[in-house]
Amino acid sequence: MIKQRTLKNIIRATGVGLHSGEKVYLTLKPAPVDTGIVFCRADLDPVVQIPARAENVGETTMSTTLVNGDVKVDTVEHLLSAMAGLGIDNAYVELSASEVPIMDGSAGPFVFLIQSAGLEEQDAAKKFIRILREVTVEDGDKRATFVPFDGFKVSFEIDFDHPVFRDRTQSASVDFSSTSFVKEVSRARTFGFMSDIEYLRKHNLALGGSVENAIVVDSDGVLNEDGLRYEDEFVKHKILDAIGDLYLLGNSLIGEFKGFKSGHALNNQLLRKLIEQKDAWEVVTFEDASTAPISYMRPVAAV
């Protein structure tokens, strides 16, 4: 049986919020079967919990924000991408502020944290959402689509009219039955343009942004001294973001996501449309792991 997973141990980290610039303390904790991923604002009294679900998404400008009343948690997508990539079903994410720390701008540090905590299988079947028919949302020339696929695949195309992007791959398709999330996607960093930074800061966004936690692009090229981690790092980061946004379904997916210039807002619209159209998906479990179209790294002992 493919079983649900949580963390073996509690693990902590410190970082800054990309948009707030605030110092943030992050604690990842094990959670019982069928809890899902739950964000907890531990700085509030009483503590406010926000389940990582599509219906709890509020703001989608520059990042994905979860809300519960007037309480919010910003920039959840990179951590959720790491949770999805490692098959973590249940965990509590405690935060000392309103934003998940940006770390290095990728999901890599979160993967390291989760692997350091160790993974633990739980005594319940893992539930997957299987896509049964095509579902699409569009906004102008932007598009996001689910199609049936026997596995999990993410295809994405970006279209930036900028010399740095024109010289590099702007489309990628990753089939996770044959490609490692950890090796091929998790280290792709978020990116931004120098020309936008003044505007963003004026609107209290990207206050914590720097070449330490983002790829910064100007008219001549990439400003980061160490360059890119992957030749197609820009589009790979969009795939990383999409995986995090899709995990707001609350379960791992069996199907393919196709994005063309899609962002957090359109990704969330697609999830909401899918949830409404109950004939477009089903929940499945696998008593025999060998029959499943998806496999995960074996749980390893905490280091």
From Swiss-Prot:
Q: What organism is the protein native to?
A: Pseudomonas fluorescens (strain ATCC BAA-477 / NRRL B-23932 / Pf-5)
Q: Which gene encodes it?
A: lpxC
Q: Gene3D superfamilies from the xrefs?
A: lpxc deacetylase, domain 1, lpxc deacetylase, domain 2
HAMAP family listed in its UniProt record: LpxC (MF_00388)
Q: Which family does it belong to?
A: Belongs to the LpxC family.
Q: What is its EC number?
A: 3.5.1.108
This chain belongs to which protein, by name? Answer: UDP-3-O-acyl-N-acetylglucosamine deacetylase
NCBIfam families in UniProt:
lpxC
Q: Which reaction does it catalyse?
A: a UDP-3-O-[(3R)-3-hydroxyacyl]-N-acetyl-alpha-D-glucosamine + H2O = a UDP-3-O-[(3R)-3-hydroxyacyl]-alpha-D-glucosamine + acetate
Q: Could you tell me the superkingdom of the organism this chain comes from?
A: Bacteria
Q: Give the positions the UniProt entry annotates as the active site.
A: 264 (proton donor)
Name its co-factor(s): Zn(2+)
- Alphabetically list the UniProt keywords: Hydrolase, Lipid A biosynthesis, Lipid biosynthesis, Lipid metabolism, Metal-binding, Zinc
